[in-house]
Regions:
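Residue(s) in the substrate-gating loop at a strand-loop-helix junction
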Residues: 195
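Active-site helix of classical SDR
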Residues: 159, 211-212
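The beta1-alpha1 cofactor-binding region of Rossmann-like NAD(H)/NADP(H)-dependent oxidoreductases
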Residues: 66-67, 88-103
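Conserved mid-core segment of classical short-chain dehydrogenase/reductases
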Residues: 107, 113, 122-148, 171-184, ...
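C-terminal helical subdomain
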Residues: 12-15, 20, 235, 252-347, ...
Length: 365
């Protein structure tokens, strides 16, 4: 039987090659960048702030916790000598609150724009979805879907605003795999925070699992078209990391296993943020393991320090989405490329949208 023909689209969507973690990046590439982080007052966000401020970035933190945010800014300014670290109160579930955060970040930016947006805000906690209350009640009370509001709707607001502000970043150009991160700090980068719950089921937390699956879906969709705005997008999917979001119950459930380290998440995020050549890639961060790659590409857990083994906490996920494609995706990407080149296809696009809408049942006479 003849081998099937593949239709790779990685070049068409401007996706960079798989991340080679053996190649070092330079944290000094962060100097002069302006970075906006939602949920930046604790956990991963605080780790990002400390690392990036120490390397000369202007960092604007948006968080609902004023006390933690103000305290973090004071500490980081004192530790690093970088006074370009700012806190802005922001409720990511409130549209206008996020708009105000972005506007303030632009105002505080030394060059009047934003280079990287990090959609980091997220919460976990008791999930009432499967607990409707007393079954003999006349009617069920309205459930609290705050986890969805923060972890999904908040991320959608952040992403939408990123696509408004990043292309307006003065001095920035369209994302490019051959850009020189050492020559120009200007960037257009959206970094999404998923989770291991983006990739695997998580019991007792249906809202959290649904939201993080949605963030993965958002990333996989956006990376196929964000080049139209010249924006590069990347995704982090941390395993259970030693932060306050991992509850006591979760720690008990993980007893005997291992938690990942914040510094590994910060390292992966810093690679993405510093290196403007990385486009459309996702990394999973877990506990450090000793592994060896087999001939078929699969990884095998091995004892420490055997021949050809390596210690790593970072893995690439969904690396092959666009190594092959089916007809609809090929056609769509061709359309997007044509749009970027000509900007003159409005009437034709209406026909295409109408045809797709008809096929999906939205438009029927």
């Amino acid at each position: 039987m003849a081998a099937s023909t593949k239709y790779p689209l990685v070049n068409k969507i401007r996706q960079s090659p798989p991340v080679d973690l053996s190649i070092p990046y330079d944290s000094a590439w962060l100097k002069g960048k302006t970075i906006l982080i939602t949920g930046g007052a604790s956990g991963f966000g605080a780790g990002f702030v400390r690392k990036w401020a120490a390397n000369g970035a202007t960092v604007v933190i948006g968080d609902v916790n004023v006390q933690k945010g103000d305290s973090l800014v004071r500490d980081v300014q004192k530790e690093t000598g970088n006074n370009s670290v700012h806190f802005v109160h922001c409720d990511v579930t409130d549209w206008q609150s996020q708009v105000n955060l972005f506007k303030e970040a632009v105002r505080l930016s030394p060059h009047g724009g934003i280079d990287t947006v990090v959609a980091n805000a997220g919460i976990a906690g008791e999930d009432p979805l499967q607990r409707p209350g007393k079954l003999d009640a006349a009617e069920p009370p309205k459930p609290d879907f705050r986890i969805i509001d923060v972890n999904l709707n908040g991320v959608l607001y952040t992403s939408h605003l990123a696509f408004f502000y990043l292309p307006r970043n003065p001095g920035s150009t369209d994302c490019n795999t051959s850009s020189d991160p050492n020559a120009n700090p200007r960037d257009r980068h959206l970094l999404l925070l998923g989770s291991i719950a983006s990739l695997a089921p998580i019991p007792i937390q249906p809202q959290y699992g649904a939201a993080k699956h949605a963030v993965l879906g958002l990333f996989r969709s956006l990376r196929s078209s964000s080049f139209m705005q010249g924006v590069r997008i990347n995704l982090l999917c941390p395993y259970f990391i030693d932060t306050p979001i991992v509850t006591t119950g979760a720690r008990i459930a993980l007893a005997g296993g291992a938690l990942g380290k914040v510094e590994d998440v910060v390292d992966a995020a810093t690679r993405f943020t510093a290196d403007s050549r990385i486009l459309g890639r996702s990394l999973v961060i877990g506990p450090k393991l000793n592994v060896r790659q087999e001939e078929n590409g699969e990884w095998t857990l091995v004892a420490k320090d055997p021949p050809e083994s390596q210690e790593t906490a970072i893995w690439e996920a969904y690396a092959e989405d666009w190594e092959d494609s089916e007809a609809f995706c090929r056609s769509l990407v061709r359309v997007l490329n044509a749009f970027q080149k000509t900007r003159g296809w409005v009437g034709w696009a209406k026909d295409i949208i109408g045809a797709v809408g008809y096929g999906l049942g939205f438009i029927r006479r």
